Each structure stands twice: as structure tokens, then as C-alpha cells.
């Protein structure tokens, strides 16, 4: 009886471990394949970021603020968590290519300046399931802003580069915005 129980337990453990071993070898071979590409590739991407703070289904929500944030003309200390749509064109109904997921916070007392920590997660096309990571200051009132790309995953592993942001549309009452991003990365 004890021997049968031992064999049963071993079979269950083996069944549970096999998929993990198989998955690990697939991930390893995929990672090696990416590393063997040789020279860096330069990729340029254009997409639109739809930041919606208003309505029944906002994609950006305030998650924290300082004690004096409401008194500040720049909302200094406000922190927002986002899951914003990325589309092919500025039209919100255009093709969804991914999501911008991360956070931004008002980090300047004298100007509208945001510190942004964002992953652009691609859900369609040749870059499906790949991401690029951006972190840096966004001087939101400037017509053109540049922020660094500091990493990536999937097809963009080891990415570095820059993002140029231009506000396409902004509603000062709600804070909703559509921002065009032109991203140049080496990977």
C-alpha cells in the first residue's frame, strides 16, 4: 500500500514538473535565438497614447497625492496609475496596437512636469507581446518633449533610444489627452 502511494505521488509530481521543464527549454532556445542576431537594429515606431481621466471608464486614475497637492497650480505630488490605449492614429477608434501601462506623477512645483515610468506593451502586429520601457521627465506644456527609452522585452530586448511626444489634443477641464509618440530604438 505504501509503495503504491509513493508511486502515485511520484507520477503526479512528474506530470506537474514536465510542462515546466519543456517551457524552460523553449524559453531558453528563444532567448538564444534573439541574442544571436548580431548587429543592433534600429526601429522607428509611431503610435498615439489616449490618456482618459474622465467618464465612466477612465484609463488613468489618481492613486496618491501630497497634503498640499490641491493647492498647487501644477498638482505637485499627484500620482496617477495608467492603462492607456495605444492606437495607430489619433482617432480613438483607430486600430489598437497596445497599451501604455505604468504611472506618472507631478514632480515639478514651478511648471507642469511629470515623471513618467511607463511600459508600452504591444498587442498586435510584428511586435505582439513585446514591450519598451520609458522613464523620464515629461515637460507636458512644451510642444515637443523627449524622453529616454531604457529597456524592453521580446523583440525589443536590450532596447535603448528615445521617444518624442507631441500633444495632439488636450481637454483642460478633464485632463484627457491624446499624445503622439514617435519612438526610435536600437535593439
UniProtKB/Swiss-Prot annotation:
Subcellular location: Secreted, Extracellular space, Apoplast
Residues carrying a glycan: 182
InterPro entries for the chain: Allene_oxi_cyc_Dirigent, Dirigent
GO BP terms: phenylpropanoid biosynthetic process
Signal listed as a keyword: yes
Signal peptide: 1-24
Pfam families: Dirigent (PF03018)
Record's keyword annotation contains Signal: yes
GO cellular component, one term: apoplast
Keywords: Apoplast, Glycoprotein, Secreted, Signal
Primary residence: secreted
Subunit architecture: Homodimer.
Family, as annotated: Belongs to the plant dirigent protein family.
Annotated function: Dirigent proteins impart stereoselectivity on the phenoxy radical-coupling reaction, yielding optically active lignans from two molecules of coniferyl alcohol in the biosynthesis of lignans, flavonolignans, and alkaloids and thus plays a central role in plant secondary metabolism.
Protein name as catalogued: Dirigent protein 23
Organism per entry: Arabidopsis thaliana
Lineage of origin: Eukaryota, Viridiplantae, Streptophyta, Embryophyta, Tracheophyta
The gene coding this protein: DIR23
